[in-house]
């Protein structure tokens, strides 16, 4: 680089130049030289320590041949293309320079290099293998021709120069303009300029005023404004800077920033982003400048790939006050600032009020029919920003490198949030830099530097931008900010816009030269003397840094064949569909980027939007961003005079790969899960930009239709503009009992469009709205304050705006309350997930209610006129709120984004309403409604939302994923396929066998629920569900006093006493009077031990007092005969049956649990005693005392109905007396009775006939105490896991009321009370069964203890406990009365 004095080494002479052949290997940063001029091209600069320097190339050498192709008369562009196509060793034939080293392209092109006055003939491109026609088309598309015209119009007309400018390549260097600025384009050979002259020229900035009347025309000063654009500020977040993988960290940092801003629900404030010559300012309409960021602090910028309205800006700051001087000691921090451009503000009529408020006049944009200050996307903003931070001095580059390095100098250890995958940014020490060659500006720099086409010295994988030869936009050759003349704007047309709006070039409002104003003259002089085209003030270290940046471009950008690069480097990314898949290839053939793409992008950037955006860090809190995170007030980096174009290399190189990473952000943000909502403000409101901080990141968001769901999160207004969004939002409000709000808003919206002259229509609609929503007797009243209430008389003079105030109130209510909850709801998350996966949007009736509110368990079909009733009843169950809370916490722990985590449940009462409101009330066999549901008894979280989850049509069920996730007891999980036609038990049997689990000793739960599932349901309803498998303890219990044995399945963590006490109590026995021991042992069993110690054991309960057992047994044997006749004949028993149902509804009797914890324990114990007494009175009539006790029980049960409905009465509070239980023979009577009692489901009643649910011998057929409920709802049909063991299957199905061979009809069986608790729970679930929902055992205690079988004390184990499955067992259809799991 420091070769300013080299002309002295090679004095020009008459002797012909020495020709030699060299081979240059490509280094990390390219070959290490830059080109200028053409026919032949001349090396304008050779970087110290580069491959070109090692082989002896010097500035001024002419290139005669490249890879055996003669390029002596080839154009500059063709030479650059040839170099760009070479990916390995470059073979060149060069002629050592004989003239001034600093010769420039304009001299050579104009023939000045050899003292001629006209252009040299050019070598035909065909000889070089380059399609000339293609290049012409590219030039036309990119605006190159316009640029030439623009150049010629800005130059003086005297002499042959105008013609030369038209004919020469666009990639001319700045030297000619520099000379022209000094001598009116007729300057002598540049070699005649001394270093002092050049320095003076640069210090005058005259290089930027070529063709202008005077330097004053530009009026350059430090405060000059380049552009200003109105953007919305979302928030800022500090980024980590301690990792080692640049690509990964870039993606993670941006993604993390977006995610946190979404989670914090930022409110977005409108600010004017002003890009000055060396800083970015944020200005509000009230507080003025609230933040200012020097260019030195800018690291890079990035656009959200799925929605280009959103963009981020990363800035740096040190922790110490020493600024850059202490960069080694101070810890460098980086922050990401996220902004949004709202295209809705693009049209002038919409934003003119905002423009007035901010105090500027709009600049018309004839290309887009909008205004430049209000861009339609974030790309124009980023283009100007990238221009600003590309120009940086070496010192700043070092600091920036530190921000993205992990301490060592390895560029690959870059951990920056920016992502230049391999820019030598990290190697910012001088030695390292010298090895980095000035590379082409790949996607963006190409246009900047020369023809905007290919790399001057073979940089970015053959991409190209010419070296630093003058940028092709004639007048603005001063590669001022981005190394490009003003970053030629993405619109070629913008090039003309500038001339249209600003008049002659001399009056351009975007003078890049101003950026240079901060460079000391000494630096500028050094720059000018370093190399010919760089005489524009570029210091040596700037070129070095520039080169390092290009080197990185080369490796990170590699062979993108479409000129696509990050907006950070200034180029406009094409549609994602047009980005080639090989863009990510790191090595291989370096395909040449189409010149047209680069030219077009650069021409647009240079003269495009006159608005700039910048990050703001020190923004003060305003009313609009009180919720936004505080911006870091980090110590400002000392502004350095060495802020030069070196920044451009750093920024651009890093930006190439950051765009790659951001491309991956499309899916990353969604995969991160929680798409939360935000408190948003109206996007057109005065002080805020309504946009959700949750950036909609959907991979398919390429077209409006595909990104429809994501756009709902942008603003509430956007949601209301989409009919589909309104539909889903309405469904959400319906679940929230506030659908009247959206209905009212829609009605008012329609009303406001009624013509004012149509009084009849206005009057009709006004009265309709008033009567439906606003009057005191409104059917669906909306919640508005008293000030907005309308009087009846106002309806006499209706006008379209009469409901505006009320509509605005409801609008704000929905926007700031319902809308934010909608964005957090599972319904919206399901829609987003479906959009990401390319599926059709889910049925809103299928998705559970929003987790945001615990009361939102209403039916999707619920009528808006009954919200209060529904909400009141939905809360009736005491376990409802508790379980919902558990569900919510579970969702927070797991995240609600996974398909199978949607196990939210809905109370039974609500589900009943779901059907009732739509005539789906499940009538029982003879027409009655399920009383238990209608009365809203205890809700169960285990069954929450079970019916809703399966209301979708069969067609949609087929489309849904047919699998579920089962979490096993050992902590592992597996995915199990579910198929229609196979029961849950059949599906699980294979799973249990594979994992060596006894299928009969497990229960299956929904994750987040505590109720076991009924395993005889069709397994297809578990699709996408998250399930939990829990082991249970199986053991046999012998009740010696009554000569009975039962098989039990219990929760292993329960103590023995807690499991046995309720069982023996149901048989009328007292555990305290019994001796508990294991079979074969004489020592009493420790009742405090966990029940898991009894797994597979036989437990014997013996009477300590043998006489009591005899009496009890004898009396119980005879009791059923009397009870049977009494029940069949006595009308009082019909009353008893009815009350039994009431008791069952309220308190379905449990198997498990000690009643000692209840305040009513004394009463319960008395009841048990009375039951035992009643059992003793066989063949005796009920006396007066007993009748009184009976009526007392009845009255208490009736009085407890209210408590039950309010969730205050626990089911264990009441125990059904034995004399109220029907004997087996009465089941026929119950089945044939005309009016079935409420509480019995249709399926329960018809279970015997339709499903063939046979009863096991002891459990049902021979038990006189079996209640109607238990008789009609066989445990085997609905029990979780199974009701009875295979051993009990020896009883074949038979008609109701019949007994199996060998049964003893007169033998009493108190265990039916135990079964009563379980069967009633399933009986209550029958409506869900009809609705296709998942059935769960609703009794809270059933999960802890389950009756597996019952028999005589001499019965073999096989009849009581299911044997463990053998490998030969194959799952088959469930047989009633069997218990195979």
From Swiss-Prot:
Keywords linked to the UniProt accession: Cell projection, Cytoplasm, GTPase activation, Isopeptide bond, Methylation, Nucleus, Phosphoprotein, Repeat, Synapse, Ubl conjugation
All residue ranges annotated as the PID domain in the record: 223-390
Protein name per Swiss-Prot or TrEMBL: Regulator of G-protein signaling 12
Ranges for domain RBD: 962-1032, 1034-1104
Signal sequence interval, chain numbering: none
GO cellular component: cytoplasm; dendrite; nucleus; synapse
Biased composition (Basic and acidic residues): 914-923, 1102-1117, 1151-1169
One Pfam family it belongs to: RGS12_us2
Residue intervals passing through the bilayer: none
Function field: Regulates G protein-coupled receptor signaling cascades. Inhibits signal transduction by increasing the GTPase activity of G protein alpha subunits, thereby driving them into their inactive GDP-bound form.
PANTHER family xrefs: REGULATOR OF G-PROTEIN SIGNALING 12, REGULATOR OF G-PROTEIN SIGNALING LOCO
Organism per entry: Mus musculus (Mouse)
Biased composition (Low complexity): 849-869, 1261-1280
Protein location: Nucleus; Cytoplasm; Cell projection, Dendrite; Synapse
Location of cross-link Glycyl lysine isopeptide (Lys-Gly) (interchain with G-Cter in SUMO2): 195
GO molecular function: GTPase activator activity
Gene Ontology annotations of biological process type: negative regulation of signal transduction; signal transduction
Modified residues (Phosphoserine): 171, 194, 661, 671, 850, 879, 943
Occurrences of domain GoLoco (ranges): 1187-1209
Biased composition, class Pro residues, residue ranges: 1361-1381
Domain comment quoted from the record: The GoLoco domain is necessary for interaction with GNAI1, GNAI2 and GNAI3.
Modified residues (Omega-N-methylarginine): 524, 633
Biased composition (Polar residues): 412-428, 1122-1132
SUPFAM superfamilies the UniProt entry points to: PDZ domain-like, PH domain-like, Regulator of G-protein signaling, RGS, Ubiquitin-like
């Amino acid at each position: 680089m420091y070769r300013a004095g080299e002309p002295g080494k090679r004095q020009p002479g008459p002797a012909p130049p020495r020709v030699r052949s060299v081979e240059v290997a490509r280094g990390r940063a390219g070959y290490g030289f830059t080109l200028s001029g053409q026919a032949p091209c001349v090396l304008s600069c050779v970087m110290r320590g580069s491959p070109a320097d090692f082989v002896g190339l010097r500035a001024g050498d002419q290139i005669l041949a490249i890879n055996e192709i003669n390029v002596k008369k080839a154009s500059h562009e063709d030479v650059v293309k040839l170099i760009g196509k070479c990916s390995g060793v470059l073979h060149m034939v060069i002629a050592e320079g004989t003239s001034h080293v600093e010769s420039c392209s304009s001299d050579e092109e104009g023939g000045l290099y050899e003292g001629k006055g006209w252009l040299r003939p050019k070598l035909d491109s065909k000889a070089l293998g380059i399609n000339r026609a293609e290049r012409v088309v590219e030039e036309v598309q990119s605006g190159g021709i316009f640029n030439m015209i623009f150049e010629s119009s800005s130059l003086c007309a005297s002499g042959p120069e105008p013609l030369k400018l038209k004919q020469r390549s666009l990639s001319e260097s700045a030297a000619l303009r520099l000379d022209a600025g000094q001598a009116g384009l007729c300057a002598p050979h540049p070699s005649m300029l001394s270093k002092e002259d050049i320095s003076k020229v640069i210090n005058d900035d005259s290089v930027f005023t070529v063709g202008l009347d005077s330097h004053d025309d530009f009026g350059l000063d430090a405060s000059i404004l380049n552009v200003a654009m109105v953007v919305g500020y979302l928030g800022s977040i500090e980024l980590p800077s301690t990792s080692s993988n640049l690509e990964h960290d870039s993606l993670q940092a941006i993604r993390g920033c977006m995610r946190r801003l979404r989670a914090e629900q930022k409110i977005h404030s409108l600010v004017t982003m002003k890009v000055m010559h060396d800083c970015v300012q944020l200005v509000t309409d009230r507080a003025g400048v609230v933040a200012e960021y020097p260019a030195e602090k800018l690291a890079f910028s990035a656009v959200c790939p799925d929605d280009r309205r959103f963009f981020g800006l990363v800035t740096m700051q040190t922790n110490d006050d020493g600024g850059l001087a202490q960069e080694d000691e101070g810890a460098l921090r980086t922050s990401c600032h996220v902004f949004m451009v709202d295209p809705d503000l693009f049209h002038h009529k919409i934003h003119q009020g905002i423009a007035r408020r901010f105090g500027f006049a709009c600049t018309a944009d004839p290309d887009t029919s909008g205004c430049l200050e209000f861009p339609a996307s974030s790309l124009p903003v980023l283009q100007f920003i990238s221009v600003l931070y590309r120009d940086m001095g070496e010192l700043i580059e070092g600091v920036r490198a530190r921000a993205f390095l992990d301490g060592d100098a390895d560029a690959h250890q870059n951990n920056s949030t920016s992502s230049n995958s391999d820019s030598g940014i990290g190697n910012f020490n001088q030695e390292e830099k010298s090895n980095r060659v000035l590379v082409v500006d790949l996607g963006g720099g190409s246009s900047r530097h020369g023809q905007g086409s290919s790399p001057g010295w073979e940089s970015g994988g053959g991409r190209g931008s010419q070296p630093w030869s003058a940028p092709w936009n004639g007048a603005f050759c001063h590669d001022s900010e981005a190394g490009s003349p003003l970053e030629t704007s993405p619109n070629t047309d913008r090039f003309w816009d500038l001339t249209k709006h600003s008049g002659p070039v001399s009056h351009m409002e975007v003078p890049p030269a101003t950026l240079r104003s901060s460079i000391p003259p000494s630096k500028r002089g050094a720059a000018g003397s370093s190399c010919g085209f760089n005489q524009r003030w570029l210091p040596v270290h700037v070129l070095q840094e520039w080169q390092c940046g290009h080197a990185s471009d080369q490796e990170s950008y590699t062979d993108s064949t479409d000129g696509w690069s990050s907006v950070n480097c200034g180029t406009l990314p094409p549609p994602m569909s047009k980005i080639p898949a090989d863009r990510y290839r790191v090595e291989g053939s370096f395909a040449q980027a189409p010149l047209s793409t680069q030219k077009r992008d650069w021409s647009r950037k240079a003269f495009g939007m006159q608005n700039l955006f910048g990050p703001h860090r020190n923004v003060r809190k305003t009313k609009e961003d009180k919720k936004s995170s505080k911006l870091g007030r980090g110590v400002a980096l000392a502004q350095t005079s060495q802020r030069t174009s070196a920044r451009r290399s750093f920024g651009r190189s890093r930006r190439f790969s950051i765009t790659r990473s951001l491309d991956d952000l499309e899916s990353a943000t969604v995969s991160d899960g929680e798409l939360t909502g935000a408190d948003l403000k109206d996007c057109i409101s005065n002080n805020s930009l309504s946009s959700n901080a949750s950036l909609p990141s959907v991979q398919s968001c390429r077209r409006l239709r595909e990104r429809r769901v994501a756009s709902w999160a942008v603003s509430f207004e956007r949601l209301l503009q989409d009919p589909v969004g309104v539909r889903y939002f309405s469904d959400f409000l319906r679940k929230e009992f506030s659908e009247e709000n959206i209905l009212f808003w829609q009605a008012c919206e329609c009303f406001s469009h009624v013509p004012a002259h149509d009084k009849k229509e206005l009057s009709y609609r006004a009265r309709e709205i008033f009567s439906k929503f606003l009057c005191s007797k409104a059917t669906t009243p909306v919640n508005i304050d008293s000030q907005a209430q309308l009087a009846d008389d106002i309806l006499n003079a209706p006008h379209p705006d009469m409901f505006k105030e009320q509509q605005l109130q409801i609008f704000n209510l929905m926007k700031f309350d319902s809308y934010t909850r909608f964005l957090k709801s599972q319904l919206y998350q399901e829609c987003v997930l479906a959009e990401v996966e390319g599926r059709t949007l889910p049925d809103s009736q299928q998705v559970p209610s929003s987790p945001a509110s615990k009361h939102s368990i209403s039916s999707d079909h619920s009528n808006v006129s009954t919200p209060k009733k529904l909400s009141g009843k939905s809360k009736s169950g005491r376990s409802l709120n508790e379980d919902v809370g558990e569900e919510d916490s579970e969702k927070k722990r797991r995240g609600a984004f996974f398909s199978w985590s949607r196990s939210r449940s809905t109370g039974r009462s609500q589900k009943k309403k779901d059907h009732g409101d739509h005539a789906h009330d499940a009538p029982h066999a003879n027409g009655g409604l399920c009383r238990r549901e209608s009365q809203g008894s205890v809700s169960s979280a285990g069954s929450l939302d079970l019916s809703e989850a399966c209301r979708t049509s069969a067609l949609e069920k087929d489309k849904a994923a047919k699998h579920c996730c089962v979490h096993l007891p050992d902590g592992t999980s597996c995915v199990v396929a579910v198929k229609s036609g196979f029961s849950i038990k059949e599906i699980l049997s294979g799973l249990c066998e594979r994992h060596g689990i006894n299928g009969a000793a497990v229960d299956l739960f929904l994750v987040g629920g505590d109720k076991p599932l009924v395993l005889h349901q069709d397994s297809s309803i578990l699709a996408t569900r998250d399930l939990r498998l829990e082991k249970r303890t199986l053991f046999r219990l012998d009740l010696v006093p009554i000569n009975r044995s039962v098989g039990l399945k219990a929760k292993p963590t329960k103590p023995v006493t807690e499991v046995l006490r309720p069982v023996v109590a149901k048989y009328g026995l007292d555990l305290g009077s019994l001796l508990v021991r294991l079979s074969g042992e004489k020592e009493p069993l420790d009742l405090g031990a966990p029940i898991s110690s009894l797994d597979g054991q036989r437990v014997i309960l013996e009477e300590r007092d043998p006489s009591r057992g005899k009496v009890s047994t004898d009396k119980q044997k005879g009791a059923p005969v009397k009870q049977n006749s009494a029940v069949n004949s006595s009308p009082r028993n019909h009353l008893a049956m009815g009350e039994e149902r009431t008791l069952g509804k309220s308190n379905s009797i449990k198997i498990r649990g000690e009643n000692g914890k209840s305040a009513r324990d004394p009463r319960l114990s008395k009841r048990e005693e009375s039951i035992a007494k009643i059992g003793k009175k066989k063949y005796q009539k009920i006396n007066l005392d007993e009748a009184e006790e009976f009526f007392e029980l009845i009255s208490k049960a009736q009085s407890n109905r209210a408590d039950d409905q309010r969730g205050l009465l626990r089911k264990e509070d009441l125990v059904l007396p034995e004399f109220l239980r029907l004997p087996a023979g009465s089941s026929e009577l119950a089945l044939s009775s005309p009016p079935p009692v409420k509480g019995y489901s249709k399926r329960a009643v018809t279970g015997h006939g339709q499903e063939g649910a046979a009863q096991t011998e002891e459990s049902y057929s021979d038990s006189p105490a079996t209640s109607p409920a238990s008789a009609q709802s066989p445990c085997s049909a609905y029990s979780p896991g199974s009701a009875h063991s295979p051993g009990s299957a020896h009883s074949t199905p038979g008609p109701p009321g019949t007994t199996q061979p060998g049964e003893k009809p007169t033998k009493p069986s108190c265990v039916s009370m135990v079964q009563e608790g379980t069967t009633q729970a399933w009986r209550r679930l029958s409506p869900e069964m009809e609705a296709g929902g998942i059935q769960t055992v609703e009794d809270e205690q059933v999960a802890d203890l389950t009756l597996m079988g019952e028999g005589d004390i001499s019965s073999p184990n096989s009849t009581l406990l299911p044997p463990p499955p053998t490998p030969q067992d194959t799952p088959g259809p469930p047989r009633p009365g069997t218990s195979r799991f």
